[in-house]
Amino acid sequence: MCTPDENDYKTSTDPDTSANTNHTLEKKKRKKRKNTNVACVNCSRLHVSCEAKRPCLRCISKGLTATCVDAPRKKSKYLAGIPNRELPMNIQPDLPPRKIMIPIYNNSSNSSLNVNNMGEQQKFTSPQHIVHKAKFLSNAADSEYSILSNIIYQDTLSNKIPIDILYSNTNSTSNSTIGNSSNNSPTGTNTSPEETEMEKIRQLYSEQRANIPPHPYPSSNQNVYSILLGPNSAKIVASQVNLFANHFPLVPVDSADNSLNFKRLLPRDPSEKSSQINWDSSINQYYLNSETVTFPELAIPLKRRKNHLVSVSLESCSPDAANIKSNVEWEHSLRYSTPMEIYTSINAPFSHTPGFHHLLVYLKHRFNQQDLVKMCRSIAEFRPIFIACSVTLTEEDMIFMEQCYQRTLLEYVKFIAQIGTPTCIWRRNGQISYVNEEFEILCGWTREELLNKMTFIVEIMDDESVRDYFKTLSKVAYRDFRGSEKMKVCRLLSPIKGKIIHCCCMWTLKRDVSGLPLMILGNFMPILN
């Protein structure tokens, strides 16, 4: 008896199996659709696949070419209340890249409008980036948002930095920064189009400045910056450049006798060594003041007595020292000493845009790429909060904000004068706005040296403290609305090169009526042990 072979079972298949085989072959013959990031309105409504080109094939076959447009994306939560016409426009891949135009800032009273009207143009190669267009009712708010976008989307993002550099453990020198190639590249045939555009802007800016009345020079009365701005201090002072509109960082100076005699109008006599430092041996106490002896000058005496309990006392000053010190020319600081002057004289908002711009340039020249990326990310957290708080503010609102700042600063100055804690106040862009006499004694920098020019709080901090500064800033200003934070260790740089003051710093944040960070008060106490 014959048994059926196994091949008989393979060949004698039923009709259902052959139909499935033919269906599989037809699927393989079909062309695969290319995925697209954005579907059209018609395909999105029916939840079917779409194409990148417009009109798509499905809309052509259905006769819906007139309505075949990209479906709108879902808005983020902080953009929910903004009309579509005021939202950022997506850059299409076929659009040519746009050039970068960085405005040159002038800190005169009518310069804020000139800066705000220049607009922002950015050069992006990725279609996911956005081009900023005016979306605020205030020119000051729109200008500040533009510079925040410039900080975030400039060549400081991680996707613009090679992976091996970003995540390498090698410590780059502080001088190797992003964007320094422009300083080293020779002029002539190697000049980039952006540099050519910047040169045209500088020429136009110089022509406009010719019609502006001369601005009083900060150092005309006291030549405080003749040696404190680095090797080119004398040239900077001789050029009469506007130190409020242009930023030159403070640079510590070598001191042979570890004193501040190099910048005092009446320096101490070098022959009288320790007799000038008031010292009470019975109670182990030093007496300091802002005129003759400051805390950085006690570094060597305190080191000799590190095994003993030592106290520091401030000598009583004249009653005139408690008077409110205001200066009309210091737009970033306290300008008036009465509330009536504040409300009647301030008729323009304070522009934070130049401060953010020069802060970024300063950080580029001081830190490496990896540190700079982390700092820019901390600044980037401020952008959505700024949109939510400022989108409905008008120019009059921004003027009122500056009046609130000056009025609040006036009250704080009266209160700070009654206490002995070293205190420094700075704006949200890091620009120092006020210091008391105790802070002068603690760090060695005088009030005129810090406020007679554009000075940032990070200038007088060491590198590690600057890194902690931006971490603390993102906590106290953008995340935690309690308004207070503590830096356990903050190292302040003194005018004496190599002399660092170890402090503990307590932050207190003051917000304006819209919720934006208005000012930051820093209370510094020295760590003696």
Curated annotation (Swiss-Prot):
Q: Which UniProt keywords apply?
A: Activator, Cytoplasm, DNA-binding, Gluconeogenesis, Metal-binding, Nucleus, Transcription, Transcription regulation, Zinc
Give start and end of each PAS domain.
Answer: 408-480
Quote the subcellular location field of this record. Answer: Cytoplasm; Nucleus
Against Gene3D superfamilies, the record matches this protein to:
PAS domain
A cellular-component GO term for this protein: nucleus
Instruction: Give additional notes from the record.
Output: Present with 85 molecules/cell in log phase SD medium.
**Chief location category:** cytoplasm
SUPFAM superfamilies, A to Z: PYP-like sensor domain (PAS domain), Zn2/Cys6 DNA-binding domain
Its function, per the record, reads: Transcription factor which regulates nonfermentable carbon utilization. Activator of gluconeogenetic genes like PCK1. Involved in restriction of Ty1 transposition.
* Family statement drawn from the similarity comment of this UniProt entry: Belongs to the ERT1/acuK family.
This chain is encoded by the gene named ERT1
The protein's organism comes out as: Saccharomyces cerevisiae (strain ATCC 204508 / S288c) (Baker's yeast)
Q: Name one Pfam family in it.
A: Zn_clus
The identity of this protein, by name, is: Transcription activator of gluconeogenesis ERT1
The record's annotation in InterPro entries points to: ERT1_acuK_gluconeogen_tf, PAS, PAS-like_dom_sf, PAS_13, Zn2-C6_fun-type_DNA-bd_sf, Zn2Cys6_DnaBD
